[in-house]
C-alpha cells in the first residue's frame, strides 16, 4: 500500500512521456527531478531517517539513470503555511527512457534488490523535467528582462 503512493507519481511521469510532454528528442538523455514527499510512521522516525539517508540512497543510486539524490526536512518557516509532508527526497535522473528506469525501480522493490521500510508513509511523488537552465542571482545582476530570458534559455 505504501509503495502504491510512491508508484503513483511514476505513472503520471510515464503518461507525460507517452503524450510527448517531455522535451528533447528520442534517444537523447533528458534530465528529471523525481520528488518524493513523505513522512515517517509515528514512532519510527529514527528508523525512517536511517533507512532514507543510507539504505535507500545506496539502493537507488545503483539503478542506471539515477545520478544524484538530496534529502530535505520541512523548514519551520513556510511561504504559504505548513505542509502535511515533513520530508522531501529529490532524485536526479538522466535517461533517454524514463519509463524503463521506473520499471527497474518497481522490479527491484518487488524482488528485494531495493530494500523498503515500514517506517515510510508516502504522501505523493512527481517527476519534473526542466524548462530552463538553473539561473543564479549572480548571473542576472544588472541584466534586463530580455537578457535574463536569454540566460534562462541557455542562449
List the model feature ranges, each with a label.
Residues 9-20:
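Bacterial N-terminal signal peptides
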Residues 1-11:
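Bacterial N-terminal signal peptides that target proteins for export
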Amino acid at each position: 500500500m505504501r509503495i502504491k503512493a510512491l508508484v503513483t507519481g511514476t505513472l503520471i511521469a510515464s503518461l507525460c512521456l507517452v503524450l510527448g510532454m517531455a522535451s528533447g528528442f528520442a534517444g537523447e538523455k533528458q534530465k528529471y527531478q523525481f520528488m518524493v514527499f513523505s513522512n515517517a510512521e509515528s514512532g519510527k522516525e529514527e528508523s525512517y531517517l536511517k533507512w532514507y539517508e543510507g539504505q535507500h540512497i545506496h539502493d537507488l543510486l545503483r539503478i542506471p539513470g539515477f545520478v544524484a539524490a538530496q534529502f530535505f526536512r520541512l523548514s519551520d518557516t513556510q511561504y504559504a503555511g505548513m505542509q502535511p509532508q515533513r520530508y522531501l527526497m529529490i532524485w536526479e535522473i538522466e535517461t533517454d527512457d524514463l519509463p524503463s528506469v521506473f520499471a527497474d525501480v518497481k522490479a527491484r522493490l518487488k524482488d528485494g534488490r531495493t530494500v523498503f521500510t515500514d517506517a515510510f508513509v508516502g504522501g505523493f511523488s512527481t517527476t519534473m523535467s526542466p524548462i530552463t537552465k538553473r539561473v543564479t542571482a549572480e548571473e542576472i545582476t544588472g541584466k534586463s528582462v530580455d537578457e535574463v530570458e536569454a540566460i534562462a534559455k541557455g542562449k
